[in-house]
Amino acid sequence: ADAGKLLAIGRFGVGYDAVDVAACTDADVVAFITAGAVDRPVAEAVVGWMIALSHHVLAKDRLLRQGKWDERSRYMGSELRDRTLGVIGLGGIARKLIDLLAGWGMNQPIAFDPFMSNEAAAKLGVRLVGLEELLRTSDFVSIHCPLTDQTRGLIGARELALMKSDGYLINTARGGIVDEDALYAALTERRIAGAALDCFAAEPVTEPNRFADLENVLLAPHSIAWTNELFRDIGRTACQGMVDLWQKRRPRGVLNPEVFERKGFVAKWERICG
């Protein structure tokens, strides 16, 4: 398509599976995400979900609403203390999550990220491990990688079978990363303790969801991190990216940095921004 007047696409958020990055590059269009703006609200939401899962907040809430006070001893919880967090993807959200959990007395966090060096992870206080070790070792597995051809279906039946029986899976990234059929089976058969899901393979979810009947699952309509501050910050970050381009600077969070080496883009940049 003719994109002679289009210089940039700013993606509100950090997931970019809906952006055809290669097509942007071919059309001499720079694409960028609002890197950093979503880190804290998503990380805070994950902390809340970790506590809600391990303390059986949903189940206990339902007990009281249903007049089942005497059944409370069925739901003995566990603390975050001495537990292990494993993150899949060690980007900004995962780093903020680790930072927020620093005072909770948890074990050293571990991460699976093939794009991160051991030295860089060590500076963050994180130990890099393989995916299988992370799944076997973690009490909480939190997904923070983008949905790509490489990560689609990354967590399937085989991977879920590696998790601890008292482990929890949290997905605030993209639904396609997790095989939902395999996850449902693992949850209903109590092969893992629970899950929290903010995203699904097919969205929007407008029909009753099968996970909704499970008391060991927390759900949100891809909005668990939506706050006033989030939308303020992603708007500011997107606008700042456009200002950076206008002032002949590269914005943060560029998805196709190679576009800056293309003669067509450079000429367009000069024509539009002077």
Regions found by a protein language model. Name each.
Residues 1-63, 77:
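Phosphate/diphosphate ligand-binding glycine-rich loop within oxidoreductases
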Residues 31, 166-274:
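Rossmann-like dinucleotide-binding domain for NAD(H)/NADP(H)
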Residues 1-5, 80, 103, 160-165, ...:
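Short, conserved loop/helix-junction motifs that constitute active-site signature segments
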Residues 43-62, 83, 102-107, 236-249:
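Oxidoreductase and adenylate-handling cofactor-binding alpha/beta cores
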Residues 1-7, 20-23, 150-169, 180-184:
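Rossmann-fold NAD(P) dinucleotide-binding segment
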Residues 14, 139, 145-147, 173-174, ...:
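Short glycine-/small-residue-rich Rossmann-like dinucleotide-binding loops
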Residues 74-165, 273-274:
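Rossmann-like dinucleotide/phosphate-binding beta-alpha-beta segment
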